[in-house]
Amino acid sequence: MSYPTKEGSDTAGNAHKNSENEPPNDCSTDIESPSADPNMIYQVETNPINREPGTATSQEDVVPQAAENSELETEIQKDQREEDLKEELLLLQTPIPRKLVSHKPLNDRSRSHSGKVEMKANNFPINHKTRFRLSTSWRVPFINSHEIRSMILHLLCDRYFSQAAGCQNTMWVKRKYIACLYHPNSFTHHERAITFRRPSRVHYYRPLTERMTSGKFCKSTDTKGKCRFRAIVRSVLFVSQIQIESIFNIKGFVDILTYIHTMNVMITNTNNGWKYFCPICGRLFNTYSELRQHSCSSSGN
């Protein structure tokens, strides 16, 4: 009976030993598995962490490069535009002479000018030497009687002549002005018609409504020929030969110019001097007073 008890005790001891040995194994396995897993997880987690900054840095490097490239392109385009604008300005800019400084007397300047010239265009000065031909407006006007007469008539026609009386009712007619100038090369007892620019003032006999309703065409009142036109002259000036010879007497010349009167008159010039033509009766008068005193110059006419 004792033998089976030994066997039972042995089996019980073996079972106890096994029971004692099994928990440590289980604990060790349970402890070892977490110790191995964190390392693997850390490695797995560190790898994406190490990889993500790399991708971010690569993207950050690409973005500044693109921005720098775009800035360079914009700067290049701006430079090209500025260069194009500079070239266009240089092509279009023309120096406008505002200040002319001469180192020669007046007699030499009447022919040509080759001295120092100061010009200004926009904001930068240009100093260089030029040679150019002076126009007639730069010359001294009081040289002889012919140029004096032409100058005075030019001023009168340029400032006070209205349109031809034969076409005074129209608004679209091309405005021509006549000045009868004496010239040595012209024929005797003939008139020279010169077209000047438009005057600063235009005088009409009728109001605007009547001119608009009267029609576009009108009949000419000329009865003496096609060479004579009726015009309105303001500040009619008569200069005799004595006054022409003493033209430098400024006071007397200014007194003549200050006389202002409005009248329908035609100034003609022949080899005998200036003549005043009445457009109503067609007579010629030597003086302006005779023209005013004759019957056609009344207020009704």
UniProtKB/Swiss-Prot annotation:
Domain of life, per lineage: Eukaryota
Disulphide bonds in the chain: none
Signal peptide: none
Disordered: annotated span: 1-77
InterPro entries: Znf_C2H2_type (IPR013087)
Tissues of expression: Expressed in a variety of fetal tissues.
Biased composition (Polar residues): 44-60
Protein name per the record: CPX chromosomal region candidate gene 1 protein
Organism of this sequence: Homo sapiens
